[in-house]
Regions:
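Glycine-rich phosphate-binding loop of actin/hexokinase-like ATP-binding domains
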Residues: 148-205
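Glycine-rich phosphate-binding loop and adjoining helix at the ATP-binding site
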Residues: 50-151
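Gly/Thr-rich phosphate-binding beta-strand-loop-beta motif of the actin/hexokinase/Hsp70
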Residues: 12-49, 154-167
Length: 246
């Protein structure tokens, strides 16, 4: 869409604005046990959102049920879908954003799934796969707290341990799925096996589920601990830490 720009001398400038009405993209967030679908206009206006149960499955069943969920979404909301331009998929997993392959996941027993290619074959639109932490960092660099910064490091400790890096304005992954997988850096000799296949990963030591397990063990060894007064959650753990009571 063209609109006139105000000029003081010479020929008036003509600005351009993206016409987003009817042009859409689909966001799919892979959670632990569910898929969140969000259909949006190119200006990020939400059209429709829905959540589908997605139980733990092996690699073959994962891909089959993922494609089936996409079918169900389009059938359910076919009257709301217009000109679909792309599909984005984010998840907590070891992924290769270049090839669109999921290597492994903390939530599902899957390995080496070419998810982006399979969905693109089915839908005919471009598909982008990215680790949720990296996608979050990209969003912060474009629209959030880190806007206008060219060098960004974001570290997230949640169900997973991950990092998003932007250097000189570009997202760092160096054509590799493991460039900033800090959660899978070996930090300790341990028999605890990570879903990536290795042992002693940082994620097996400091992710929130692991911290809660350690707190539960610590509470059992200390009957007078404040942690024994409530169910141990990340909130009660943080509260105990603020009070410096173990």
């Amino acid at each position: 869409t063209e609109f006139p720009g105000l000029g003081f001398r010479g020929r008036p400038a003509v600005g351009l604005k993206l016409e987003s009405k009817g042009w859409q993209f689909l966001c799919i967030r892979v959670n632990n046990g569910s898929l969140l679908f969000s259909l949006r206009e190119l200006d990020n206006q939400l059209v429709v959102e829905d959540t589908f149960d997605f139980p733990k499955q092996n690699s073959d069943a994962f891909l089959h049920h993922f494609l089936a969920a996409i079918d169900t979404f389009f059938q359910r909301y076919q009257s709301r879908v217009e000109r679909l331009t792309a599909i984005s998929i984010t998840m907590n997993a070891i992924v290769d954003p270049i090839s669109g392959v999921i290597y492994s996941s903390p939530y599902y027993a899957i390995q080496d799934i070419p998810l982006a290619d399979k969905i693109q074959e089915k839908t005919g639109v471009a598909v982008f796969l990215q680790h949720s932490v990296t996608a979050w960092t990209m969003a912060e660099s474009l629209y959030g707290a880190a806007k206008n910064n060219t060098d960004i490091l974001q570290i997230v400790i949640d169900d997973i341990v991950g990092a998003g890096v932007v250097t000189n304005g570009k997202t760092l992954h160096s054509n590799s799925h493991s460039a900033v997988e800090i959660g899978h850096t070996k930090v300790i000799d341990s028999q605890t096996q990570c879903y990536c296949g290795a042992k002693g990963c940082l994620e097996t030591e400091i992710s929130i589920p692991q911290l809660i397990k350690k707190a539960q063990h610590l509470a059992q060894e200390n009957p007078t601990s404040i942690l024994n007064q409530y169910p141990i959650t990340v909130e009660t753990l943080c509260d105990a830490d603020r009070k410096s009571v173990v």
